[in-house]
Structures are given as structure tokens and as C-alpha cells.
UniProtKB/Swiss-Prot annotation:
Range of residues in the leader sequence: none
Lipid metabolism in keyword set: no
Lineage: Bacteria, Bacillati, Actinomycetota, Actinomycetes, Micrococcales
Chief localization: cytoplasm
Locations listed in the record: Cytoplasm
Disordered: annotated segments: 174-194
Complex formation: Monomer.
Binding site for Zn(2+): C27, C225, H250, E254
Residues the record lists as binding ATP: K284
UniProt keyword list: Aminoacyl-tRNA synthetase, ATP-binding, Cytoplasm, Ligase, Metal-binding, Nucleotide-binding, Protein biosynthesis, Zinc
Span of the annotated motif 'KMSKS' region: 281-285
Cofactor comment text: Binds 1 zinc ion per subunit.
Protein name: Cysteine--tRNA ligase
Length: 487
């Protein structure tokens, strides 16, 4: 198994620190707005990684943080106390910063759940880990890598020139970097020094401040992740992930402050690529954005998940007007085979279907396994999936039920690894499934009789009635088969 490590800029063999166990941290959301496709693509990429590691037999501990205190959250909350230009005084939403953060956190969780992103082992909030952050800051001060601001602001800064490996993650020299944007330049030794602790400023809510040895204030963004990952995964762990846009300054600063504190920190750094809109960077200002919610208005959750997870995680994923249609067609081909195979192999619509669909058989094809072991090469893995679907359909047509069953087991296992087996699947009622099957089979029996007597009008009428109800009928050499139309 080999993954690309951003820090070494090469694909390396992955060997976990503890045999049989993997520790993974990936950056979650700063909950100051609704999720965008970049957030969701990143979550799906690391969900695929987790599922593959688990399939390979590893016990995976996953930590995904929630940044629930930040400059952007405070700014957004302050704006929410004033009416929008389209709203009247009665429509003003008075919302405290913590309430705003919680509301958007729930929106992220809903999006993750809808698109089949597994819940992490731990999902810590920054505001719940202030003591750990204080301890990390004090340790950096004691080691000579941090200092209280040279004015009365109450800030504490990381001294980038005290750490000779600063810039190594992104292969930059300090003198070529711009000044850190996350704090005012006053009180700094170097404009590139970044804030570990931000002193309380006039006009900020007192509820967004905590007492510290350096004055009342709140943590810096970069410090939050270092403190939380260390608490849950220790000072050395296997994989740190996130979007490519977080590589600098966020991950560069995380690595510097953690290693300067004496922590080995991450063994691998993995970054997923961005999502573009018809070849251009998405931007609200020019109106070329598409949100997960908008995608879900156009396609089912499984189709959206297929689209957002179909590219190799490090590559750019480009959104085109036809992207979801193409993903829907691919999902339809997969589901068509599954429906056909279940009907043939289970002996009825429901009986035996659960064993066929929901049991893990450990039978992914060698080509699929080789692709996933090769830095999560999902495009090649999907090619193996569709090859298996074609082989399964061929086996069904030939009446080779043994080969068809093997193909079905392989397909369901591959879908499970890719997170496509049960994305936002509605609860199934076995009695309802049985009743539906009996009714549809009765209609198909009547249609077969009509066709036998060449009553084509009656045959077409039955087919049209079933189609209107969402039942797709396909005629084959062994008679008619049916499946439910997918969203």
C-alpha cells in the first residue's frame, strides 16, 4: 500500500506506527457558513481512505475537528445582528457566535450523513480544548519558539525564525513568504510570525474569550488543530489530511509548532485537490459556484457521492453541466445489474436478498485492490467495478449463476469500500418489499399473457402503468425483468 506524502513529495510505502492500527486526523470545517463542495469532496476522499484501510484489516481511529471559534465566526455573528438590505427590522436574526457555529455545525453533519461520510471516532470542538492549547503554548515559550507580543495586545506568537525547518512542508524559504494574515503586525518580531493566542479586542463578545497566563483571549486557528490531534492521537500519528488549500499556511504552521514542541507529529501528509467549475476556480463573486444542496436538487445522494468521489483524490475535479448526468448513468448501470442479479439469485424479490447485498464477502477483484493500494487510484478502481458489472451481466445472460453470484459479491464489496452501498438509503420494510414484488410480478404475469396472445395494446398499457409507478421493465431472452427507477 503506497500513498503520496506531501512532506516528502513522493509516493511512499505506508507502514503504520502500530501494526494493525491506523491513526488518521483530517481537518474538518470552520463552521461559519454552509458546506461547499470542497468541504464535502475532502470528507469523501478521507472516508474512502478510511474504508479501504478497514477493508485491508486495519483498526482505524479517525479524528475530524470542528473549528467553532474563529475570526470569521465572530465576524459573521456580528453581521447577523444587523438587517440584510432585503430584510426588514422584524427579520433581523439576533444570533450569538456560539449559536451560529452550532447551527452551521449541524448543517455540515447533515451533509456528511446524507452523502454517506462515516462519522469519525472523535469529532472534537476547539472550544472544548482550551487547557490543552494553553499547555502547548507554554511549552513553546519554554523552548524559545514562542513569545508574548511586544505590546499590550495579549497576543502570543510563534517565532518562525526560531525553527529552522519552517517552510519544509511547502518547500518555501521564510524570506519568500508573505506576512501572516491572522493577526495584526503590532508586537511581532517578524511579520511572518503567526498567532498562537489572540488577546481580546474591544467590541468582541466576552463569551468568546478565556482567561490565560497571557491575558484574556482565544486560541489561534493553527494551534487548535495541533492541540486536539495530540490529545486524541498522541504526539506521533500516521496520517494528517486536508484540502490542498490548507497546505499553507495552516498545515505548515501546524507542523512547525508541533515539531517545535518536541512532537514527531504526522508520518504522512495527504492533501486532496480542489473542485473547479468548467475549468475555473469557483467564486461567489463571479457566480460560478454549485453547492452540495444544489447538486442534491439535481441528483440522488448516491449520484452526488459517485461524482464527488470518482476522481483520484489529489487531482482537480471539474464540474460540468453534464457531470451529474454522467454519474447518474454510471450508477444506473451498477444498480441495474444488482437488481437483475438479486432477482435471479435470490429466487424471489426479497428472500435471500439481504445475504446477497449486505454481507461482506472479501472478494474485491485484484485490479480494484491494486488500484486502491496505489495511492487510492479511484478511477482505476471504478474501471474494475464496471468491468465486474459487465461480467456479471454476461454471466446472468448465459445462465451461469455461480459466476453471477461471485460478480455480485465483488460489486457489493467494492461499493462498500467506495461508500456507495447505502448512501442515504431510506429504511427498507421487508413486508413492503414483499408486497411490491408480488404486485409487480402479478402485473408482469398479466403482461406475459397479453404478449402470448399478441395483445400488444394491453402489454404496452401494463408496461406504461409500471413505468409511471417508477418500475422499469426490461425484456430479455428469459422473460421480463424489473427494477425500481433510481433518483
Amino acid at each position: 500500500m503506497r500513498f503520496y506524502d506531501t512532506a516528502s513529495a513522493e509516493v511512499r510505502d505506508f507502514v503504520p506506527l502500530i501494526p494493525g492500527k491506523v491513526s488518521l486526523y483530517y481537518c474538518g470545517a470552520t463552521v461559519q457558513g454552509l458546506p461547499h463542495v470542497g468541504h464535502i469532496r475532502s470528507a469523501i476522499a478521507f472516508d474512502q481512505l478510511t474504508r479501504w484501510l478497514e477493508y485491508r484489516g486495519f483498526r482505524v481511529t479517525v479524528v475530524r475537528n470542528v473549528t467553532d471559534i474563529d475570526d470569521k465566526i465572530l465576524a459573521k455573528s456580528a453581521l447577523s445582528f444587523e438587517p440584510d438590505f432585503e430584510e426588514g427590522p422584524d427579520d433581523v436574526r439576533e444570533e450569538e457566535w456560539w449559536a451560529l457555529a452550532y447551527r452551521y455545525e449541524q448543517a455540515f453533519l447533515k451533509a456528511y450523513d446524507t452523502l454517506g461520510v462515516s462519522r469519525p471516532t472523535y469529532e472534537p470542538r476547539a472550544t472544548g480544548h482550551i487547557p490543552e492549547m494553553h499547555a502547548l503554548i507554554q511549552g513553546l515559550i519554554d523552548r524559545g519558539h514562542a513569545y508574548p507580543a511586544l505590546d499590550d495586545s495579549g497576543d502570543v506568537y510563534f517565532d518562525v525564525r526560531s525553527w529552522n525547518r519552517y517552510g519544509s512542508l511547502t518547500r518555501q524559504k521564510i524570506d519568500d513568504m508573505q506576512g501572516a494574515p491572522d493577526a495584526d503586525p503590532r508586537g511581532k518580531k517578524d511579520p511572518r510570525d503567526f498567532a498562537l493566542w489572540k488577546g481580546h479586542k474591544e467590541g468582541e463578545p466576552t463569551t468568546a474569550s478565556w482567561v490565560s497566563p497571557w491575558g484574556t483571549g482565544r486560541p489561534g486557528w493553527h494551534l487548535e488543530c495541533s492541540a486536539m490531534v495530540t490529545k486524541y492521537l498522541g504526539t506521533e500519528f500516521d496520517i494528517h489530511g486536508g484540502g490542498l488549500d490548507l497546505r499553507f499556511p495552516h498545515h505548515e504552521n501546524e507542523m512547525a509548532q508541533s515539531q517545535a514542541a518536541g512532537h514527531a507529529f504526522a508520518n504522512f501528509w495527504m492533501h486532496n485537490g480542489m473542485v473547479t467549475y468548467q475549468g475555473e476556480k469557483m467564486s461567489k463573486s463571479i457566480g460560478n459556484t454549485v453547492s452540495p444542496a444544489e447538486m442534491l436538487e439535481l441528483a440522488s445522494p448516491r449520484v452526488v457521492r459517485y461524482y464527488l468521489g470518482q476522481a483520484q483524490y489529489r487531482s482537480v475535479l471539474d464540474y460540468q453541466p453534464t457531470s451529474l448526468q454522467e454519474a447518474a448513468a454510471a450508477v444506473e448501470r451498477i444498480d441495474g445489474f444488482i437488481a437483475r442479479a438479486v432477482r435471479t439469485l435470490s429466487g424471489s424479490v426479497v428472500s435471500g436478498a439481504a445475504e446477497l447485498l449486505f454481507s461482506s464477502h472479501g472478494t474485491v477483484p485484484d485490479a480494484f485492490a491494486a488500484a486502491m493500494d496505489d495511492d487510492l487510484n479511484v478511477p482505476q478502481a471504478l474501471a474494475a467495478l464496471h468491468d465486474t458489472v459487465r461480467a456479471g451481466n454476461t454471466a446472468l445472460t448465459a445462465g451461469d449463476n455461480s459466476a453471477a453470484r461471485t460478480a455480485l459479491h465483488s460489486v457489493t464489496d467494492m461499493l462498500r469500500v467506495l461508500g456507495l452501498n447505502d448512501v442515504a438509503a431510506p429504511a427498507r420494510d421487508e413486508q413492503a418489499d414483499t408486497a411490491l414484488g408480488v404486485l409487480v410480478e402479478a402485473q408482469l404475469g398479466a403482461r406475459a399473457q397479453a404478449r402470448a396472445t399478441k395483445d400488444w395494446a394491453a402489454s404496452d398499457a401494463i408496461r406504461d402503468t409500471l413505468a409511471a409507478a417508477g418500475v422499469v421493465v426490461e425484456d430479455g431472452p428469459d422473460g421480463a425483468s424489473w427494477s425500481l427507477k433510481r433518483g
